[in-house]
Design a protein with these regions (language model features):
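Copper-binding active sites and cupredoxin-like electron-transfer domains
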Residues: 1-411
Length: 411
């Protein structure tokens, strides 16, 4: 007999995931991980005590942000795939069905296991051909943040989205209790404007940068209560390194894909770099309420639909050229003469299925952000972790124009 113990509906919404988790959290020996804009993989228990997970790899439609959908290759219909959560010591039995048009295998990145379960096509196993189902089985002897991803035609399969987290909680946890635990995949894509299929052949010139395969303003915020101890796990199987910066707080890097970092070797940071093939886990106490920016600090990564090899027109008067171009392209709008902030306010129609360069709005206006950007929302006295709305700043704590102050003084 197979017994369903724990799982969540595969809904790409952090809020639906939160409500499902609330019903099961009391019976768990750990704080469940939240995968913003993602989900956690259900499992069943076999008679021998093995936790059974089922993965189908195939094609899917994936929303990067409102207004942009891509043709992705996915695990269980989503990218990143559902997060697998286990406890150190668990016996895992994972069935993988291939619905792709080519062979594949699944590698359990950073996990110590028998060589034949490592998941490398041709080297440690035969390729899982289209229509076939393979079984992986191993005991989880570690705890920490790990990843699973394709290991056959990596360029195409991972380039189109086949990756996910495998998180192993310690059997005997030590240290302070974690109140909120998040997992975020860092990735980059090249999608030709006006098209839907990412080009996996691109090596460096990416134009879409994502947290969990979503670009701002499509990224879910991280909602926490004031005083919560927060853990954020980052994973990267892309091409680029990403320095992720948190406003308002310092954190400590507590573990890597290689294991825990002893407290004596930890130091405070406000930016953590995760290189390709690595995971990094940070912890901090969210003790100051507000809406705090959380983003990649490479200048082009918190933007969307980035172009390459464009002419530098800073300081160039484009009025004459603009009029001539409009004769050929009605509605053409010149840009870049005074910087790119004007993109926040322009309503220039772009190619179909293409995000604006900077499309996010805050309570005070355009943010000038896109791509790898989200918000840590810290609030006092939250009843739940639903979106709390804009932060109500106390009077006198928001920067403002001194011209307005002068006008008030004159009156």
């Amino acid at each position: 007999m197979t017994v369903v113990l724990f799982g969540f509906i595969n809904i790409p919404s952090i809020y639906a995931q939160e409500k499902n988790k609330a019903m099961a959290v009391e019976n768990l020996p750990y704080t469940p991980v939240v995968t913003p804009n993602g989900s956690t993989m259900p499992w069943t228990l076999d008679k021998d005590g093995a936790k059974v997970f089922r993965i189908t790899v195939g094609k899917c439609q994936h929303e990067v942000a409102p207004g942009m959908v891509i043709n992705a290759w996915c695990y269980n219909g989503q990218t990143p795939g559902p997060t697998i959560e286990v406890v150190e010591g668990d016996l895992l039995r994972i069935y993988v069905k291939n619905e792709l048009p080519e062979g594949t295998a699944v590698h359990w990145h950073g996990i110590f296991l028998p060589n034949g379960m490592d998941g490398v096509s041709g080297l440690t196993q035969k390729s899982i051909e289209p229509g076939q189902t393979f079984k992986y089985e191993f005991r989880m002897t570690q705890h920490g943040t790990f990843m699973y991803h394709s290991h056959g035609d990596e360029m195409t399969q991972m380039g189109l989205g086949t990756m996910g987290f495998l998180i192993s909680h310690p059997k005997n946890p030590t240290g302070p209790k974690i109140d909120r635990d998040f997992a975020i995949f860092l990735n980059e894509w090249f999608v030709e404007p006006g098209t839907k299929t990412p080009n996996p052949n691109i090596m460096t010139d990416f134009n879409i940068f994502t947290f969990n395969s979503r670009a701002f303003p499509g990224t879910a915020p991280l909602v926490v209560k004031t005083g919560d101890r927060v853990r954020v796990r980052f994973g990267n199987v892309g091409q680029e390194s990403h320095p992720i910066h948190l406003h308002g707080f310092a954190f400590k890097i507590v573990s890597t894909d290689g294991g825990d970092i002893p407290p004596s070797a930890q130091w405070p940071e406000t930016t953590v770099v995760t290189f390709p093939g690595q995971t990094r886990t940070v912890e901090f106490v969210a003790d100051v309420p507000g809406d705090w920016a959380f983003h990649c600090h490479r200048r082009h990564h918190p933007m969307n639909a980035m172009g390459h090899d464009a002419a530098n027109v800073l300081g160039v008067n484009q009025d004459d050229v603009k009029d001539k171009v409009r004769d050929l392209v009605p509605g053409y709008m010149a840009m870049g003469e005074n910087g790119m902030d004007e993109m926040n306010y322009m309503n220039m129609k772009g190619p179909e299925n293409t995000l604006p360069m900077m499309g996010g709005q805050g309570q005070f206006g355009p943010t000038g952000m896109g791509g790898m950007f989200t918000v840590l929302m810290v609030r006092d006295n939250l009843k739940d972790y639903d979106h709390p709305g804009d932060y109500p700043h106390p009077k006198g704590t928001v920067a403002g124009s001194i011209d307005q102050e002068k006008e008030k003084g004159e009156k």
